[in-house]
């Protein structure tokens, strides 16, 4: 690909609207925690390329160099103006540079890499043009949908290659020579090794999205094998929420003289439009207080986070018995059931999603009014990801955490990481306990239904579907893109 003349980047620093847990790389970065910071990523060279800034504000995708037809697609999808990660990375991508983008889920990073790839595809159409690697099946499906929507005017063809689906039908899709492949690493490697005639020797673009999660899910060795069969002459984009040592090793192995775009804030910073509070209650009353809160916010969309699969299923049953439109989401559901749950929640045919941390990160759920931590997460980073499902894109939102006598130490660690004491949500106990009888009846119903579910599935209560690998054992390649939670 010819090297294009470097354009000057027009952008002014503005607060990052997304909850972020990115590490500051220096004390100066900490002092400018809400500024977008653009740095060179070639750590082995002290003279890494830097991008000069200008004072003018980028107001449109056209200003970034995006062609009219793609600008029209952005407008049709409601993309009014570029997000910070888009404003920073798109001009550099159009110059033909490899990129590292540090930004959170919900920051608009999918369009940040999709638009340059689609624009290059329109200039030189070919099959098997781009490969996007994602850590989970749901995220792969969402990325494919974004490419098809943005590339609708040129009828871009995408193939989603993920675990849990039929290999033969996927091989047929690959045989039709799609423009873009969106895949999870394990299943892609299966096809590279076993599908006759399938090769990526002509690939022009590689994207590794949520690279930190790819490595957290132990995809590292598989990524190494995939990289060995890809052409060296390609453009590579790596997007990650954090820049860990593993991610740094991956970027050194896969990118050529990249530039780093960092839309960063304090490690545990939350947005100003997010109202966070907690309820300190006895453990035995958790169900009753949860129902009280959901009644207080009746008609609004909510995600209720739990720690285990069984608790997710139990609460979904309990809430349905009380007349709430609830649906569970966890890693033991089949792929079609998980996609169905997300679809119902997005369309608001169900307004309460009861979920494990499957839903904390990486899923395209555009508007959530309330987040309720029924079970506290075990670490502050997960808390940030959970509450980041609300108060997105400048909207306001509420996050409630139920804290019991067993959670005090964990809660204090979360507050310490946030750097502030959160407000207690005061309620009259008498008002809450009015619900005691109704909730008790629903609890008994949930216990009975859970027992029936376990008996039907031949389970003894450990999980609802299948069994987890023994401690220390590794999941098979086909199951690695399936969330555990």
Swiss-Prot record:
Residues 449-458, 475-485 have a biased composition (Basic and acidic residues). Residues 90-261 form the Helicase ATP-binding domain. Residues 285-433 form the Helicase C-terminal domain. It catalyses: ATP + H2O = ADP + phosphate + H(+). Belongs to the DEAD box helicase family. DDX47/RRP3 subfamily. A motif (DEAD box) lies at residues 209-212. It comes from Ajellomyces capsulatus (strain NAm1 / WU24) (Darling's disease fungus). This is ATP-dependent rRNA helicase RRP3. Keywords: ATP-binding, Helicase, Hydrolase, Nucleotide-binding, Nucleus, Ribosome biogenesis, RNA-binding, rRNA processing. A motif (Q motif) lies at residues 59-87. It is an enzyme of class 3 (hydrolase). One of its GO terms (biological process) is rRNA processing. It is found in: Nucleus.
């Amino acid at each position: 690909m010819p090297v294009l003349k470097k354009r000057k980047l027009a952008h002014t620093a503005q607060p990052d609207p997304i909850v972020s847990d990115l590490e500051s790389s220096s004390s100066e970065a900490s002092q400018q925690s809400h500024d977008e910071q653009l740095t060179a990523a070639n750590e082995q060279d002290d003279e890494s390329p830097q991008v000069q800034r200008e004072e003018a504000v980028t107001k449109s995708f056209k200003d970034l160099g995006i062609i009219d037809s793609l600008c029209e697609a952005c407008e049709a999808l409601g993309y009014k103006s570029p997000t910070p990660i888009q404003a920073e990375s798109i001009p550099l991508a159009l110059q033909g540079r490899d990129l590292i983008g540090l930004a959170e889920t919900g920051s608009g990073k999918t369009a940040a890499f999709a638009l340059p790839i689609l624009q290059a595809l329109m200039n030189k159409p070919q099959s098997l043009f781009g490969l996007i690697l994602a850590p989970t099946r749901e995220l792969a499906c969402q990325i494919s949908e974004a490419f098809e929507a943005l590339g609708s005017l040129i009828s871009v063809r995408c193939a989603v290659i993920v675990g849990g689906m039929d290999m033969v039908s996927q091989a047929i899709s690959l045989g039709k020579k799609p423009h873009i492949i969106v895949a999870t690493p394990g299943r892609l490697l299966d096809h590279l090794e076993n599908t006759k005639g399938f090769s990526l020797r002509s690939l022009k673009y590689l994207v590794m999205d949520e690279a930190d999660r790819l490595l957290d899910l132990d995809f590292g060795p598989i990524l190494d094998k995939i990289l060995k069969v890809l052409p060296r002459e390609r453009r590579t984009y790596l997007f990650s929420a954090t820049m860990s040592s593993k991610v740094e090793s991956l970027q050194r192995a896969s990118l050529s003289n990249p530039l780093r775009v960092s839309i960063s804030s304090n490690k545990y910073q939350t947005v100003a439009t997010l109202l966070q509070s907690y309820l300190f209650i006895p453990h035995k009353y958790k169900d009753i207080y949860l129902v009280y809160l959901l009644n207080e916010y009746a008609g609004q969309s909510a995600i209720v986070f739990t720690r285990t699969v069984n608790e997710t299923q139990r609460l979904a049953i309990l809430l349905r018995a009380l007349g709430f439109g609830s649906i569970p989401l966890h890693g033991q559901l089949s792929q079609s059931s998980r996609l169905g749950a997300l679809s119902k929640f997005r369309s608001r045919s169900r307004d309460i999603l009861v979920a494990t941390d499957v839903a904390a990160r990486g899923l395209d759920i555009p508007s959530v009014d309330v987040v309720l931590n029924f079970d506290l997460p075990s670490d502050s980073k997960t808390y940030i990801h959970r509450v980041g499902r609300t108060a997105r894109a400048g909207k306001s939102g509420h996050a409630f955490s139920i804290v019991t006598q067993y959670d005090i130490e964990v809660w204090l660690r979360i507050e310490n990481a946030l750097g502030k004491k959160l407000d207690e949500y005061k309620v009259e106990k008498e008002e809450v306990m009015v619900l005691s009888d109704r909730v008790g009846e629903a609890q008994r119903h949930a216990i009975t239904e859970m027992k029936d579910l376990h008996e039907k599935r031949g389970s003894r209560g450990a999980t609802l579907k299948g069994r987890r690998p023994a401690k220390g054992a590794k999941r098979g390649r086909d199951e690695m893109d399936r969330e555990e939670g």
